Amino acid sequence: MKKVVVTGGCGFIGSNLINYLLKKNYFVINVDKLSYSANIYNLKNINTSKYVFVKTDINDKKIISRILKKYKPSVIYNLAAETHVDRSIDSPEPFLHSNIYGVFNILECMRYYNNKSKNKIKLIHVSTDEVYGDILDKSKRADENYPFKPSSPYAASKASADHLIKSYIRTFNFPAIISNCSNNYGPKQFPEKLIPKLILNILNNKPLPIYGKGLNSREWIHVEDHCRALEILSIKGKIGESYNIGSGKNLSNIELTKLLMKIMKNKLSTIPKKVRINFVKDRPGHDIRYALNSKKIQKKLKWKAFIKINEGLSETVDWYINNLEYFKSISKREYENRIGLKI
Protein backbone atom coordinates (compact mmCIF):
# COMPACT_ATOMS: atom_id res chain seq x y z
CA MET A 1 0.00 0.00 0.00
CA LYS A 2 1.42 3.36 -1.04
CA LYS A 3 1.73 5.85 1.83
CA VAL A 4 1.57 9.59 1.11
CA VAL A 5 1.54 12.78 3.15
CA VAL A 6 -0.83 15.61 2.25
CA THR A 7 -0.03 18.89 3.98
CA GLY A 8 -2.92 21.32 4.26
CA GLY A 9 -5.28 18.39 3.97
CA CYS A 10 -8.19 20.06 5.76
CA GLY A 11 -8.32 22.90 3.26
CA PHE A 12 -10.18 23.09 -0.04
CA ILE A 13 -7.81 21.38 -2.49
CA GLY A 14 -6.16 19.26 0.20
CA SER A 15 -9.41 17.69 1.43
CA ASN A 16 -10.52 16.97 -2.12
CA LEU A 17 -7.13 15.39 -2.84
CA ILE A 18 -7.32 13.21 0.27
CA ASN A 19 -10.75 11.88 -0.67
CA TYR A 20 -9.51 11.25 -4.20
CA LEU A 21 -6.40 9.35 -3.00
CA LEU A 22 -8.33 7.25 -0.49
CA LYS A 23 -10.62 6.08 -3.28
CA LYS A 24 -7.46 4.98 -5.13
CA ASN A 25 -6.40 2.89 -2.09
CA TYR A 26 -3.58 5.10 -0.81
CA PHE A 27 -2.71 5.35 2.88
CA VAL A 28 -2.92 9.09 3.61
CA ILE A 29 -1.31 11.06 6.43
CA ASN A 30 -3.00 14.46 6.68
CA VAL A 31 -0.84 17.22 8.18
CA ASP A 32 -2.72 20.43 8.94
CA LYS A 33 -2.47 23.11 11.63
CA LEU A 34 -6.19 23.93 11.24
CA SER A 35 -5.94 27.60 10.36
CA TYR A 36 -9.05 29.75 9.82
CA SER A 37 -9.81 28.31 6.34
CA ALA A 38 -9.28 24.65 7.25
CA ASN A 39 -12.04 22.46 8.60
CA ILE A 40 -12.28 18.85 9.74
CA TYR A 41 -15.83 18.91 8.31
CA ASN A 42 -14.25 18.66 4.87
CA LEU A 43 -13.23 15.09 5.74
CA LYS A 44 -16.19 14.10 7.92
CA ASN A 45 -17.20 11.12 5.78
CA ILE A 46 -13.84 9.35 6.02
CA ASN A 47 -14.15 6.03 7.83
CA THR A 48 -11.05 4.00 7.13
CA SER A 49 -7.91 2.78 8.88
CA LYS A 50 -5.91 4.06 5.89
CA TYR A 51 -6.19 7.66 7.08
CA VAL A 52 -4.30 9.48 9.83
CA PHE A 53 -4.63 13.13 10.88
CA VAL A 54 -1.75 14.98 12.55
CA LYS A 55 -2.52 18.51 13.77
CA THR A 56 0.69 20.48 13.39
CA ASP A 57 2.37 23.36 11.58
CA ILE A 58 4.68 22.46 8.68
CA ASN A 59 7.25 24.68 10.42
CA ASP A 60 7.47 22.21 13.32
CA LYS A 61 10.68 20.40 12.42
CA LYS A 62 10.47 17.78 15.17
CA ILE A 63 6.95 16.62 14.34
CA ILE A 64 7.47 16.65 10.55
CA SER A 65 10.66 14.60 10.98
CA ARG A 66 8.83 12.20 13.30
CA ILE A 67 6.04 11.73 10.72
CA LEU A 68 8.55 10.86 8.00
CA LYS A 69 10.40 8.42 10.24
CA LYS A 70 7.23 6.71 11.50
CA TYR A 71 5.21 6.38 8.29
CA LYS A 72 7.96 6.34 5.62
CA PRO A 73 5.80 7.90 2.89
CA SER A 74 6.79 7.71 -0.76
CA VAL A 75 5.34 11.14 -1.63
CA ILE A 76 4.59 14.44 0.09
CA TYR A 77 1.96 16.59 -1.58
CA ASN A 78 2.57 20.07 -0.20
CA LEU A 79 -0.65 22.10 -0.22
CA ALA A 80 -0.17 23.84 3.14
CA ALA A 81 -0.22 27.55 2.37
CA GLU A 82 -1.78 30.91 3.02
CA THR A 83 -3.59 31.65 -0.25
CA HIS A 84 -5.88 34.67 0.04
CA VAL A 85 -4.44 37.60 -1.93
CA ASP A 86 -6.38 40.27 -0.01
CA ARG A 87 -5.07 38.98 3.31
CA SER A 88 -1.52 39.02 1.92
CA ILE A 89 -1.88 42.71 1.04
CA ASP A 90 -3.06 43.66 4.52
CA SER A 91 -0.85 41.25 6.49
CA PRO A 92 2.03 39.69 4.50
CA GLU A 93 3.94 38.08 7.38
CA PRO A 94 1.87 34.86 7.72
CA PHE A 95 2.41 34.24 4.01
CA LEU A 96 6.18 34.31 4.43
CA HIS A 97 5.90 32.05 7.48
CA SER A 98 3.83 29.33 5.78
CA ASN A 99 4.66 29.67 2.11
CA ILE A 100 8.43 30.17 2.36
CA TYR A 101 9.72 29.09 5.77
CA GLY A 102 7.27 26.19 5.90
CA VAL A 103 8.48 24.94 2.53
CA PHE A 104 12.09 25.34 3.69
CA ASN A 105 11.36 23.19 6.74
CA ILE A 106 9.78 20.45 4.62
CA LEU A 107 12.78 20.50 2.28
CA GLU A 108 15.24 20.19 5.16
CA CYS A 109 13.28 17.40 6.90
CA MET A 110 13.04 15.49 3.62
CA ARG A 111 16.72 16.05 2.81
CA TYR A 112 17.82 14.69 6.19
CA TYR A 113 15.49 11.70 5.86
CA ASN A 114 16.47 10.91 2.27
CA ASN A 115 20.19 11.04 3.10
CA LYS A 116 19.69 8.27 5.66
CA SER A 117 17.07 6.15 3.87
CA LYS A 118 17.18 3.81 0.90
CA ASN A 119 13.59 4.71 -0.01
CA LYS A 120 13.56 8.37 -1.02
CA ILE A 121 10.53 10.61 -0.50
CA LYS A 122 9.36 12.63 -3.51
CA LEU A 123 7.91 16.14 -3.12
CA ILE A 124 4.98 17.31 -5.24
CA HIS A 125 4.82 21.02 -4.51
CA VAL A 126 1.55 22.75 -5.39
CA SER A 127 2.13 26.31 -6.60
CA THR A 128 0.07 28.79 -8.59
CA ASP A 129 -0.27 30.55 -11.93
CA GLU A 130 0.02 33.85 -10.06
CA VAL A 131 3.81 33.53 -10.02
CA TYR A 132 3.80 34.50 -13.71
CA GLY A 133 1.91 37.73 -13.08
CA ASP A 134 -0.05 39.69 -15.67
CA ILE A 135 -0.24 38.26 -19.20
CA LEU A 136 -1.82 41.16 -21.02
CA ASP A 137 -1.30 39.86 -24.56
CA LYS A 138 -4.37 37.69 -25.16
CA SER A 139 -2.51 35.70 -27.81
CA LYS A 140 -0.06 34.44 -25.16
CA ARG A 141 -0.25 31.88 -22.37
CA ALA A 142 2.53 31.24 -19.86
CA ASP A 143 4.46 28.00 -20.30
CA GLU A 144 6.87 26.58 -17.72
CA ASN A 145 9.74 28.75 -19.02
CA TYR A 146 7.79 32.00 -18.74
CA PRO A 147 9.54 34.49 -16.41
CA PHE A 148 8.16 35.00 -12.91
CA LYS A 149 6.60 38.41 -12.27
CA PRO A 150 4.52 38.13 -9.07
CA SER A 151 2.38 41.13 -8.14
CA SER A 152 1.01 40.41 -4.65
CA PRO A 153 2.81 39.34 -1.46
CA TYR A 154 0.97 36.01 -1.83
CA ALA A 155 2.26 35.46 -5.37
CA ALA A 156 5.75 36.56 -4.35
CA SER A 157 5.79 34.08 -1.45
CA LYS A 158 4.80 31.23 -3.79
CA ALA A 159 7.37 32.30 -6.39
CA SER A 160 10.02 32.39 -3.65
CA ALA A 161 9.18 28.83 -2.63
CA ASP A 162 9.32 27.68 -6.26
CA HIS A 163 12.80 29.21 -6.62
CA LEU A 164 13.92 27.66 -3.32
CA ILE A 165 12.80 24.20 -4.44
CA LYS A 166 14.54 24.63 -7.79
CA SER A 167 17.75 25.51 -5.94
CA TYR A 168 17.47 22.28 -3.92
CA ILE A 169 16.88 20.31 -7.12
CA ARG A 170 20.00 21.83 -8.69
CA THR A 171 22.29 21.79 -5.64
CA PHE A 172 21.21 18.66 -3.78
CA ASN A 173 19.67 16.59 -6.60
CA PHE A 174 16.47 16.88 -4.59
CA PRO A 175 13.50 14.70 -5.71
CA ALA A 176 10.83 17.34 -6.31
CA ILE A 177 8.25 18.30 -8.91
CA ILE A 178 6.54 21.70 -8.99
CA SER A 179 3.00 22.22 -10.27
CA ASN A 180 1.60 25.64 -11.15
CA CYS A 181 -2.17 25.50 -11.30
CA SER A 182 -4.85 27.94 -12.37
CA ASN A 183 -7.84 29.01 -10.23
CA ASN A 184 -9.61 26.04 -8.66
CA TYR A 185 -13.32 25.76 -7.91
CA GLY A 186 -15.57 23.03 -6.57
CA PRO A 187 -17.01 21.75 -3.29
CA LYS A 188 -15.56 22.63 0.14
CA GLN A 189 -13.95 25.94 -0.82
CA PHE A 190 -13.78 28.53 1.96
CA PRO A 191 -16.28 31.34 1.25
CA GLU A 192 -13.78 34.20 1.12
CA LYS A 193 -12.91 33.06 -2.43
CA LEU A 194 -14.88 34.44 -5.36
CA ILE A 195 -17.09 31.55 -6.49
CA PRO A 196 -18.36 30.39 -3.07
CA LYS A 197 -18.79 34.02 -2.00
CA LEU A 198 -20.98 34.73 -5.04
CA ILE A 199 -23.01 31.55 -4.52
CA LEU A 200 -23.63 32.23 -0.84
CA ASN A 201 -24.43 35.90 -1.40
CA ILE A 202 -27.07 34.91 -3.95
CA LEU A 203 -28.54 32.36 -1.55
CA ASN A 204 -28.52 34.96 1.26
CA ASN A 205 -30.05 37.74 -0.85
CA LYS A 206 -26.94 39.96 -0.77
CA PRO A 207 -25.22 42.08 -3.44
CA LEU A 208 -22.34 40.57 -5.41
CA PRO A 209 -19.10 42.56 -4.87
CA ILE A 210 -16.86 42.65 -7.95
CA TYR A 211 -13.51 44.44 -8.12
CA GLY A 212 -13.15 47.35 -10.54
CA LYS A 213 -15.15 46.79 -13.71
CA GLY A 214 -15.04 42.99 -13.46
CA LEU A 215 -12.71 42.65 -16.45
CA ASN A 216 -9.98 40.68 -14.68
CA SER A 217 -9.67 37.31 -16.42
CA ARG A 218 -8.89 34.01 -14.72
CA GLU A 219 -8.47 30.44 -15.95
CA TRP A 220 -10.80 28.09 -14.06
CA ILE A 221 -10.25 24.39 -13.36
CA HIS A 222 -12.40 22.01 -11.33
CA VAL A 223 -10.60 20.72 -8.23
CA GLU A 224 -11.21 17.10 -9.28
CA ASP A 225 -9.26 17.63 -12.50
CA HIS A 226 -6.47 19.18 -10.44
CA CYS A 227 -6.37 16.22 -8.03
CA ARG A 228 -6.12 13.80 -10.93
CA ALA A 229 -3.21 15.82 -12.34
CA LEU A 230 -1.36 15.77 -9.01
CA GLU A 231 -1.57 11.99 -8.77
CA ILE A 232 -0.29 11.66 -12.35
CA LEU A 233 2.66 13.92 -11.49
CA SER A 234 3.56 11.67 -8.55
CA ILE A 235 3.53 8.60 -10.81
CA LYS A 236 4.79 9.79 -14.19
CA GLY A 237 6.17 13.29 -13.64
CA LYS A 238 9.88 13.85 -14.23
CA ILE A 239 11.91 14.75 -11.16
CA GLY A 240 13.19 18.31 -11.27
CA GLU A 241 10.53 19.53 -13.70
CA SER A 242 7.69 22.03 -13.39
CA TYR A 243 4.25 21.43 -14.91
CA ASN A 244 1.44 23.89 -15.54
CA ILE A 245 -2.06 22.59 -14.78
CA GLY A 246 -4.89 24.50 -16.42
CA SER A 247 -8.15 24.00 -18.27
CA GLY A 248 -7.54 26.56 -21.00
CA LYS A 249 -10.90 28.14 -20.12
CA ASN A 250 -10.72 31.82 -19.19
CA LEU A 251 -13.59 33.96 -17.93
CA SER A 252 -13.61 37.56 -16.79
CA ASN A 253 -15.02 38.09 -13.31
CA ILE A 254 -18.13 39.72 -14.75
CA GLU A 255 -18.65 36.81 -17.18
CA LEU A 256 -18.26 34.33 -14.34
CA THR A 257 -20.71 36.24 -12.15
CA LYS A 258 -23.36 36.40 -14.87
CA LEU A 259 -22.91 32.69 -15.63
CA LEU A 260 -23.34 31.80 -11.95
CA MET A 261 -26.46 33.97 -11.72
CA LYS A 262 -27.90 32.19 -14.75
CA ILE A 263 -27.15 28.74 -13.31
CA MET A 264 -28.64 29.64 -9.94
CA LYS A 265 -31.72 31.24 -11.46
CA ASN A 266 -32.44 27.91 -13.19
CA LYS A 267 -32.09 26.10 -9.86
CA LEU A 268 -33.94 28.60 -7.66
CA SER A 269 -36.58 29.72 -10.20
CA THR A 270 -35.76 33.33 -9.37
CA ILE A 271 -32.89 35.46 -8.07
CA PRO A 272 -33.68 37.37 -4.82
CA LYS A 273 -34.35 41.10 -5.32
CA LYS A 274 -31.33 42.41 -3.39
CA VAL A 275 -28.91 40.33 -5.45
CA ARG A 276 -27.18 42.67 -7.85
CA ILE A 277 -23.67 43.17 -9.16
CA ASN A 278 -21.92 45.78 -7.03
CA PHE A 279 -18.62 47.09 -8.41
CA VAL A 280 -16.21 47.92 -5.56
CA LYS A 281 -12.86 49.71 -5.44
CA ASP A 282 -10.16 47.59 -7.06
CA ARG A 283 -7.43 46.11 -4.90
CA PRO A 284 -3.79 47.27 -5.23
CA GLY A 285 -1.73 45.48 -7.89
CA HIS A 286 -4.70 43.52 -9.23
CA ASP A 287 -3.49 41.51 -12.24
CA ILE A 288 -5.67 41.75 -15.33
CA ARG A 289 -5.15 38.30 -16.82
CA TYR A 290 -3.69 34.91 -15.93
CA ALA A 291 -3.42 32.22 -18.59
CA LEU A 292 -1.47 28.96 -18.63
CA ASN A 293 -0.03 26.92 -21.45
CA SER A 294 -0.54 23.35 -20.19
CA LYS A 295 0.66 21.50 -23.28
CA LYS A 296 3.59 19.93 -21.41
CA ILE A 297 1.46 17.87 -19.00
CA GLN A 298 -1.06 17.18 -21.77
CA LYS A 299 1.49 15.81 -24.23
CA LYS A 300 4.08 14.19 -21.95
CA LEU A 301 1.82 12.80 -19.23
CA LYS A 302 -1.44 12.44 -21.21
CA TRP A 303 -3.50 14.52 -18.78
CA LYS A 304 -6.21 17.00 -19.64
CA ALA A 305 -9.07 18.71 -17.84
CA PHE A 306 -12.37 16.89 -18.42
CA ILE A 307 -14.94 18.89 -16.45
CA LYS A 308 -16.57 21.71 -18.42
CA ILE A 309 -17.15 25.00 -16.59
CA ASN A 310 -20.98 24.95 -16.84
CA GLU A 311 -21.17 21.37 -15.60
CA GLY A 312 -18.66 21.98 -12.81
CA LEU A 313 -20.31 25.18 -11.61
CA SER A 314 -23.74 23.54 -11.57
CA GLU A 315 -22.39 20.68 -9.44
CA THR A 316 -20.61 23.17 -7.17
CA VAL A 317 -23.78 25.21 -6.64
CA ASP A 318 -25.65 22.03 -5.67
CA TRP A 319 -23.00 21.20 -3.08
CA TYR A 320 -23.22 24.62 -1.44
CA ILE A 321 -27.02 24.55 -1.40
CA ASN A 322 -26.89 21.18 0.37
CA ASN A 323 -24.28 22.31 2.93
CA LEU A 324 -25.57 25.70 4.07
CA GLU A 325 -25.38 24.80 7.78
CA TYR A 326 -21.64 24.28 7.42
CA PHE A 327 -21.17 27.78 6.06
CA LYS A 328 -23.27 29.36 8.77
CA SER A 329 -20.87 27.88 11.32
CA ILE A 330 -17.75 29.34 9.67
CA SER A 331 -19.11 32.65 8.35
CA LYS A 332 -17.38 34.65 11.10
CA ARG A 333 -13.98 33.55 9.76
CA GLU A 334 -14.49 35.23 6.37
CA TYR A 335 -12.29 38.13 5.38
CA GLU A 336 -14.42 41.22 4.91
CA ASN A 337 -11.91 44.02 4.45
CA ARG A 338 -11.84 44.10 0.64
CA ILE A 339 -13.99 42.01 -1.71
CA GLY A 340 -15.73 40.64 1.36
CA LEU A 341 -17.13 44.04 2.31
CA LYS A 342 -20.22 43.87 4.50
CA ILE A 343 -22.84 45.29 2.16
Regions found by a protein language model. Give the residues of each.
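Proline-centered turn/helix-capping motifs that create local helix->coil transitions or kinks
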Residues: 124, 133-139, 173, 189, ...
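Intrinsically disordered, low-complexity segments enriched in polar/charged residues with Gly/Pro
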Residues: 14, 81-82, 186-187, 229-230, ...
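C-terminal substrate-binding subdomain of Rossmann-fold SDR/epimerase-dehydratase oxidoreductases
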Residues: 20-23, 38, 56, 196, ...
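Residue-level recognition of oxygen-bearing side chains
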Residues: 63, 84, 94, 101, ...
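Active-site helix-initiating loop/hinge in glycosyltransferases
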Residues: 186, 190, 219-222
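N-terminal Rossmann-like NAD(P)+-binding domain of SDR-like oxidoreductases, especially those catalyzing
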Residues: 1-184, 253, 288, 315, ...
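Generic preference for well-ordered secondary structure
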Residues: 27-30, 51-52, 72-73, 79, ...
